[in-house]
Design a protein with these regions (language model features):
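Structured interaction and signal-relay segments at domain junctions
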Residues: 1-62
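Short linear motifs in exposed loops
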Residues: 35, 77-78
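A short beta-strand signature within small-molecule sensing/ligand-binding domains used
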Residues: 57-68, 73-76
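Regulatory loop-to-helix N-cap segments in sensory/regulatory domains
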Residues: 78-90
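Conserved small/polar residues in nucleotide/adenosyl-binding loops
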Residues: 93-100
């Protein structure tokens, strides 16, 4: 399984490119890696989305995306913001996840 340090490095690099704050959370809502404050990201937000049938969802300023490995749900990615950059960053991540 991929380590938290690798995930942190990856989202730090993505933030440098996209200027979008990102967070990765496990299925219990615990932060694995983040470039943002967790102030308004609740455990209920993460666990509720993880349990839903949706692969991606926008809730307020949070764009949520399920991260799967060989079909198994492992993490939830959260991108924060309302700009087109956030939508494009999440869309790119979503497309890359389905391409592998």
């Amino acid at each position: 399984m991929i380590t938290g340090q690798i995930i942190q490095t990856s989202i730090d690099e993505l933030k440098a490119i996209t200027k979008v704050d990102l967070g990765v959370y496990d299925l219990n809502g615990s932060e694995v890696a983040s470039t943002m404050e967790k102030d308004d990201i609740t455990t209920d937000l993460i666990t509720g989305f993880a349990a839903s049938p949706a692969d991606s969802q926008v809730i307020g300023v949070h764009h949520l995306l399920k991260i799967r490995d060989e079909g198994d749900l492992l993490y939830v990615l959260v991108a924060r913001g309302m700009t087109d950059d956030v939508y494009m960053a999440v869309s790119y991540t979503h497309l890359r996840a389905h391409a592998t």
